[in-house]
Structures are given as C-alpha cells and as structure tokens.
Amino acid sequence: MSKLLDRFRYFKQKGETFADGHGQVMHSNRDWEDSYRQRWQFDKIVRSTHGVNCTGSCSWKIYVKNGLVTWEIQQTDYPRTRPDLPNHEPRGCPRGASYSWYLYSANRLKYPLIRKRLIELWREALKQHSDPVLAWASIMNDPQKCLSYKQVRGRGGFIRSNWQELNQLIAAANVWTIKTYGPDRVAGFSPIPAMSMVSYAAGTRYLSLLGGTCLSFYDWYCDLPPASPMTWGEQTDVPESADWYNSSYIIAWGSNVPQTRTPDAHFFTEVRYKGTKTIAITPDYSEVAKLCDQWLAPKQGTDSALAMAMGHVILKEFHLDNPSDYFINYCRRYSDMPMLVMLEPRDDGSYVPGRMIRASDLVDGLGESNNPQWKTVAVNTAGELVVPNGSIGFRWGEKGKWNLESIAAGTETELSLTLLGQHDAVAGVAFPYFGGIENPHFRSVKHNPVLVRQLPVKNLTLVDGNTCPVVSVYDLVLANYGLDRGLEDENSAKDYAEIKPYTPAWGEQITGVPRQYIETIAREFADTAHKTHGRSMIILGAGVNHWYHMDMNYRGMINMLIFCGCVGQSGGGWAHYVGQEKLRPQTGWLPLAFALDWNRPPRQMNSTSFFYNHSSQWRYEKVSAQELLSPLADASKYSGHLIDFNVRAERMGWLPSAPQLGRNPLGIKAEADKAGLSPTEFTAQALKSGDLRMACEQPDSSSNHPRNLFVWRSNLLGSSGKGHEYMQKYLLGTESGIQGEELGASDGIKPEEVEWQTAAIEGKLDLLVTLDFRMSSTCLFSDIVLPTATWYEKDDMNTSDMHPFIHPLSAAVDPAWESRSDWEIYKGIAKAFSQVCVGHLGKETDVVLQPLLHDSPAELSQPCEVLDWRKGECDLIPGKTAPNIVAVERDYPATYERFTSLGPLMDKLGNGGKGISWNTQDEIDFLGKLNYTKRDGPAQGRPLIDTAIDASEVILALAPETNGHVAVKAWQALGEITGREHTHLALHKEDEKIRFRDIQAQPRKIISSPTWSGLESDHVSYNAGYTNVHELIPWRTLSGRQQLYQDHPWMRAFGESLVAYRPPIDTRSVSEMRQIPPNGFPEKALNFLTPHQKWGIHSTYSENLLMLTLSRGGPIVWISETDARELTIVDNDWVEVFNANGALTARAVVSQRVPPGMTMMYHAQERIMNIPGSEVTGMRGGIHNSVTRVCPKPTHMIGGYAQLAWGFNYYGTVGSNRDEFIMIRKMKNVNWLDDEGRDQVQEAKK
C-alpha cells in the first residue's frame, strides 16, 4: 500500500486519541528506526581496559559486531564500597572513550615494517652468507653499510616485510651482539608495567634470559619522587582516591585533579559536601583551581619555600607555643626526630651537623652486638641513652626486634624529642642557606649563605674516649626552620613579619604568596589534623616533581604532614600521583618479568644515567658539582663533572651500569679458568689491578655502548626522551637540531673519571626495534616496526594506585591484519633466537655486576664514610665497597623453552619481595596442573607459560595480593622479623584465589600484603603507611622511622641533610646557545614547563582524530597575555621555541591563566601532526623534549646506605626538565617542507 499521502500534512485523517486527548495513535513510517537499531546492535560485550599510563585503570565494555569493535562504554559493576563511601564507578574519560577509533584508523600499524635500506642490505648479505649471524656481521663490519641506513632514520623509507624474515634478522643481530660484545649491549625500554603487566613481562623476560639490560622508567619519566625513598624507604605508596573522601582538609599542590585524574575527581568534589576544605596551589589558573575553595599561585619552582614557610607556622603554633599532644606523641614514635646527631666543629667555633650517633660509637655498643654501626641512638625522658627497636640494624642478622614498639634493650621506654631541659650547653650550629642565590628569573632574599643558630646540646663520651656534642633531630629541625627557642639566637625569627628564613614574610618574598594566606592555610591544615588525628592530606603531581630540586619541594610538604601526624592515618598523608606505578601483584609478577625462575640476578639499569651517558648529553654539561655544593662542604673532595659522580657511584656499587665491563662478560670465565680463579674472584682482581675497566669510564669506546634496543609499550622518542636531539645524533646517527657546543669546543669542565675523546660516536645503535599499534614518533626513527595488538585484542592485566582492584585487558576480537600481542611477538623472537644461536652461543657463563640493592643485606655497606677502592681508600669487596659480582649460567639454545615455562628456581629458592621470602612449592604444583607442563626438552616437567593467559595465571598464583594462601605465608615471614603477629590481616582471605576468568567476570579487590604499607579492607580505605602506624612495622629507613634527617656524607656535602629552599638551577641552555640569526620579531627568555595535557594520555590519543578535533589540531604552546604583547604574538600565531638543545614549532595559545615569565607546552604532543619547519634548524620542528637535556643530581646517585640504596625504579637519578629556559619568538616564515614544488611559504605579518 502506498504511503504517499501520509507524507502530506493536510491530506490525512486525524488519528485515534487516548489519555484524554493527550496521546494520539500514529501510522507514520517507522522504517528509519531499523538503521538506528542496526547502528546499536552488537554480537557480544567483552570487558577490557586501556593499557595507558594514566593511573585511571578503568573497566570498559567493548561492543563487538561482525568481528569488529564498534564502540566502548564504561563498566558499572565494580565491587561496592562500604555504606559511608561513594562507589568508584563510573570510571573513564573522553580519551578512553575514543580508543576504538585507533583500531581501524590510518594510524594503525597493520604489517611488520622495516627500513628499506636495511632490508636490502640484509637480503643481499643472506645471499652471500647462509648463516644469518654471519650475514648480520658482514653488514656491521662495513661502516658504509651501517651509515647508509642509520643516517636516514626518521625520514621515512619503510617497506612491508613478514614475521619470519624480521624475527630472523632480530635474532641474528642479538646473537652477533652478544657473541661479539656481550649480552648487556642488548637493551630494552618499556614503562609502567601495571598498565599491561604481561605485555611488559614479555620483553623483559626475553631480555633477562639473554642477560640483556632492562631499563627503568619511573625515574627517567621523573615520576619517581626521590623524597619518598629518602623519607620512607619506599618507592611510592599512596592512598587510593576513595580515601580522599575520608579527609577533612585537602591541598591539591601541583596536581590538576580534574584534568589528569578524571575518573577519580568525583571523590574530590564529593568530599566537599562533608565540609572538607580544598586548596589549590598551582602557578597557573588550572582546572583544579576552579574546583577549590581557595587558590594560591606561587612563582613556579618555589614550592619548597612555600612549604617551609607553612612548616614554620605549624612548628611554632602546634609544637612550641601550644603543643598538640597528638603531634608530639606521633613525632616521638613514628619519626627520626628523637635520634641523636653528632656535631662536627668548624674553625669559627660553631658546629655543623654530622652523622647520626650509632650504638657502635658508644662504649660496649650499648649492649648491641649485631650491626651496632647501623643502630641509631636516642635519649629517653629519664635522660638515659637508649637504642630503640626498629632501626635498620635490627632488620638484618637477627629476628624479633625490627618493630616500632616503645622498647629499647627489652625495656619500655619513652623517647625525648628535644634535649632542651636535659642539655649540657648551648652551641651555635651552622646551616646552609641557598635562598640568596641570584637568578634574573626568580626572586631571592639575601642572607649569609651560612646561618648559625643556637641549639641545646648534650656532651657524650665516645668509645674512643673523646667527647662529642650531640643534638636531637627535632632540635635541628626547629633551628633549620628558623624558630626562636629562647636561646638568645639572633638569627631566629621572633615573629612572622620578620624576613628571615623561613618565615611567612620570607616566603612571601620568594613565592609571591601573601603571608597572611600562608599563615591561615598552614594554621587550618594543622588545626584540622590536630582535631581529627591526622585527616589532612596533600595531593601532589608532576608539576612539583619535575624540577631539579624536586626532593626539596617534596620534603617540604612531607615534613608538614609528619609534623601534623598525617602519614598512615585514613584520610591523611601524602598522595603523589604521577604514573600508574602500582603493580599490585608485584611479587607474583617479578619472577615472570625478569626470568627469576631461571636466572638470578637480572641486569637492570636506571635509564636516566643510561641515556645521559649514551646519548652523550654529558658532553654538553654546563652545570658543575661545585655550584651545587653546600657552603659548609669541603669543595676539594667533590671535584669533577656530574658524570664523574655517576661513574664513582657505579664503581662503588651504588648505581647499576650498562654496559658493565670494558670487555665481553661471556669471555671472563675462560680467563678465570686459566688463572685458576672463579669468575667472581678474577673479575674483582682484574678491576682492582686496572686490567679490566668498567665500561662507564670509557663511554666512547666502540665496545662500550648499547647496540640493540627494543622499545615496546612506549613512545621513547615522542614522549619521555629528554634530550631528544642528542638521542637523534648520538644514539641514532641521524640529523639533529642541537644548537649548543660540546665541552671540547667551549673549554668547559672535562671529566676526571671518564676518558674524553674529541670525536664522540654517532649512531651507536645498530638496531632499533619498536613494537606499537600505531605509527608513533619512535616508530618513525626505528629500523624495524612490529605491529602489536591493541588493548581490545589481547589478554593482560591492569592495576593502579587509584583503586584497589585488579581487572583485565581481554581479546574482544582477534588482532587485526598481521598484528600480534606482545607476548606472542617476543615468544616468536625467542624461538628464532634459539634456532639462530646454534653454533655461536651455547651454555655460557655470564658475569653480572649487581648494585648494592635496597631491601637486601647489601644496603648495609659503608656506615660512616665514603671510601673508593679505585683511589686506594679501601679494598674492593664485592657486595660491600663495590658491586656484587655474580656468575650466571645461561643456556642460549634453550631460550624459547625457558621463555615458555616456569623455571626450577621457584622451587629451590622460593619467592618474595622487599626483604622477605616464602616457599612457593604449593603454587608451582598448582600451576603445573592448571597450565599443564612441558612434555620434553630442556624444560621438561616445568609448568607451561605458552599464552598470555598462562602468564597471567602465574602472576595471580604467586602473588600474595591475589592468592590468600600466599598472603598468609608472606605475613608470617614478616612476623618472624618484626616479632609481631600480622597474619590476622589476611587469615580471613586465606582461601581466596583469584583467577583470570574471575577478573574477566568482575574487577576483584586485592588482598592485603606485607609488601605494601596499607590495608585492603572493608573497613578502611587503602592509605600508605597505615600498617607502619597501626601494626608498628618499621619504615625501611636507617632509623626505621620517617627519616627527616639524611646523614649520608654526600647529602650533607650538598646541603640536603635537612630540607631547604633551593631555587631552580641555571642550565645555561639560553646563555650558552650558538648565535641564532634574528628574524625580525622580538625574542624573550621564558621558563619552559611541560604539564600533562587534556586531550591525550602522554602521546597516546594526541594524534587521535577525535581528540585533535576537540583541541586545536596540532602542537600548541601557552604564553601569558603580558609576554604575548611584548612579543607581538596573537592567539594562534605560529611561534618557534629554541635553546641550545634544539628547537620546536607550534601555535601560540595566549591566555590570562598563564603568569608572565613562563610558557607551557603540554607534554608529548606527537611530532607527526601538523608541524612546519624550524627557522633555526632548517628541519621540521621538534617535540617538547627537543629543548630539554638531562642534568643528573649527585645526591640521587647514593647507594648502599639503608633507604638510600638503589632498586629498579626505586631510587636513582631522575630526568627533570622544568628548570629549562627557552627563547620564544613569532615565526616569520612558515615552511611545511613538503619538497613537492607546490608548497607556499607563509610569511607572518608584523
């Protein structure tokens, strides 16, 4: 029947009505509804998440139709919270909601790709050599062939290949490199395993079976806050976001919660309905400032000054004038403030704080015979010297006393915070002051660089009969903050209005924040903590941690929290959120990831030192150690270049090294056999005699640099790679935009410990292999690009510090085109390696140098002074004064069999983490039944790890966080050390065993584990330090308590034994730049900041069409209206940003939210989107890291000293970048460098 007439308004009858005429029956055509129904039809829904470093860890419904992913929406079935707490869902953000666009976009990598010039060389070599290893050798031994493909990296030229061909090439390159130079010349970089832990483990397991180098990430990203290890002996442990709701006062300090913590921001707003006050502290008017009750805008880089001014108020009002019993008792028990510190005399009659008194300093060691040099001393309220339980000396070599019970020598005791009232004299003690250092871009307040303040002291007779004055840390802290104690101290402040360090008036001068605001907020923060017993919280972010002196910023805030008894209390404490660092089932994951089931120890390296060295950034270093030293230090003992300090640290075992030795470690066994020595003895003797050198001492030797590099789950050259242009030149051997001069040309400070060569090696990497699902900046510079499965096409697991759940990535559809999951890719490479290595590598003995690790007895190395064996100051003792030297047996032809099975070391040595261990036989037996076992071959009878799900089951079975039986064993193991019963924390979950299919059904809350410092409970939200405070488990520090005083000799020499305001450093990136020709527009030097962006998670999503549409469609730089007027820049103009490190081009965003003197380029905007050429370099503009360069800090190199000991991603040099300054100007000519003859150069109008 025709419906033609129905389409006309007037040629139809009125339809039947109903509901008293309010409704009408219609007979119109409804065929249009079918298209709507078809659009939203689906065949299935699969749970997955996004393996991106955002900390969100959000569970999503993935809709599949006809074998294709059509869209995604948020899951809403998280386990419910207790009645007084909001639920977690829905969790998600616009970036995550756009991810399905990637799967079928033009950006998707579909096939294995290789650089055309390289594959032509490879195919030609295979025609001449039937052995792939010899074929690769023929290319490597011809400099012209190497140069031919290295110099065109980053300039296109990829062609499609196949998996078999490329696996063979990669394996041959690895075999030749290992055979010729050593396995530590093969390295891999991948970040943040928590976001897809099996994918991470795939690459590091392969590398570890080879003996390759696994590079760290948390320190390199500058997500690692060194202040956390310094204070707590913990990498980072923080409250889950739900605990914000338990807080009564929150300061969001440099953390842009709604923008970078979108899924969690609802807790931040919901808690305000309870009356919680929220404060934003950011230099720019950011998203978080709009959410808060009050906004403070300190000058960027002056956060420690503001924190110390607030600390001054807290100490004066709540510790001295009107002491809070809660604060005093908390500090007495849970901080190092009662501990005694030696005073060392100065020539002028004053003293300088030295190291902490140890039991070994006193007669008979105060009755302590086990590690007395590592046990700190205090005075109790009766005036007696005591050795309180809990210091690091109780942790190793004895059991039952490593706890925070108020006991010393088996007797109840109460420690004294201050010596005032028990003192023998009052002495002048000198403190360094850095706030007077002049910098044209930052405010300073002139004072004597040495401030002498009066302290109460007690005189002790030491074991050698000498008398030594001592002070308590508490008295040192009060003096350091400039508080008047009634001791006739002219340098202390009598009231807040005095402009003396570190009063509110002084803070106003430095930060620009009015002192009345400093006083009010500090008072409110402390008063709330006093009334609620610690429910005041500080949420911190990358904005504060990315400065060179980030540890001073953080220690200032941490001190506020400790003064107020907030750490370890629900709703209180330190909440640092930068990076999805919390891999909750960590101890179950470690054996899988680093092949600890087959070989121990693995080779691990801190990336900051690695890239600083091997991208030759040290050759351009203009910052000297001398300018960083305290005015109280003996400068003659701390001479040299910054890389010298890194080399000394590696030599003494403080830091790892890669490559490690100046020759192939696989050849040492043969030399040792000839000498009749073990490999360990031979290596130690050869190092001591100088016959064998460490590779770090000769970085430009042809055999002492990395040659093969794997990058996966990362955009190293488009996101985290500080010193981008240096990487291009020295690692890759391609064109770069460096505008500075090497030290050789500029007559700068040359290294003392490192051999200087006039010509540095360019193009150190023979092979760069990148795994990704999209064409990223790193892919553009790679030799081989392998297409990985997306997060909706593979099985994996994901956890975060923001919530207590573990949930999966699931293969909703098969990997598209020829992509494969990371596990399958590395399994394929391992199989090719096992085939190719035959005849070249067999069963080999590898000599591995292992640094003095935190959470091991090696953290008790040199207790009182720093002695260097190379200088003859002590003997070379592996594991004590030098790295531990370990001979590791490798079976290279069995690499594939070992990769796909769980090795026997788990049965023999068990498992553990953070200094405790337990038996795992039950779990190994279970995995053999669950995953089945190898039927034959070198791994016969071992549990299979064939698939990613098998790997997930290994993690879940071995981890106390996901296996209640293991959790009980872990708590028992800890209880043997502490002498306390802790199993009650997990007994009720003993029968709970989480499997992969369980988390696919619903996210599961993990089980409380002793390797973390909070509890997973239905009664309390996860809060870091909770078990330390409530279970009396010591912090893993020298004193066993929260460590405010850092007494290592290097910390004291660099003026950082106590917190101090240190202004941003002068990197000289502008002043030491080559002469850049003017372009007719004005130029200005501005501070260059790189906060996290709104339209991407790092570089992911930054080239996603949906996000580009919502943003400006390409790279942008924010500047203030004031600076823009001065530079004749208007909004959306093309500008160029440049300094000695390189140049970048972007559009300007002119905004009143940005203060004058700074510019912001949101971090990791991909260089592949809408970037014209640079007028400075003549090349296409760079990325945000084109104008940065790494500058390591010596105090981050300390090791073998309790909490100041290296651990993978735990402590070490960090890649800061916010002290950089750049020149900015409007571009005159915008040239797109299309080279097609049709492009027009756009000329700007003046």
UniProtKB/Swiss-Prot annotation:
PROSITE patterns: 4FE4S_MOW_BIS_MGD, MOLYBDOPTERIN_PROK_1, MOLYBDOPTERIN_PROK_2, MOLYBDOPTERIN_PROK_3. One of its GO terms (cellular component) is plasma membrane. The keyword Electron transport applies. GO terms for biological process: anaerobic electron transport chain; anaerobic respiration; nitrate assimilation; nitrate metabolic process. [4Fe-4S] cluster binds at H50, C54, C58, C93. Belongs to the prokaryotic molybdopterin-containing oxidoreductase family. This is Respiratory nitrate reductase 2 alpha chain. It comes from Escherichia coli (strain K12).
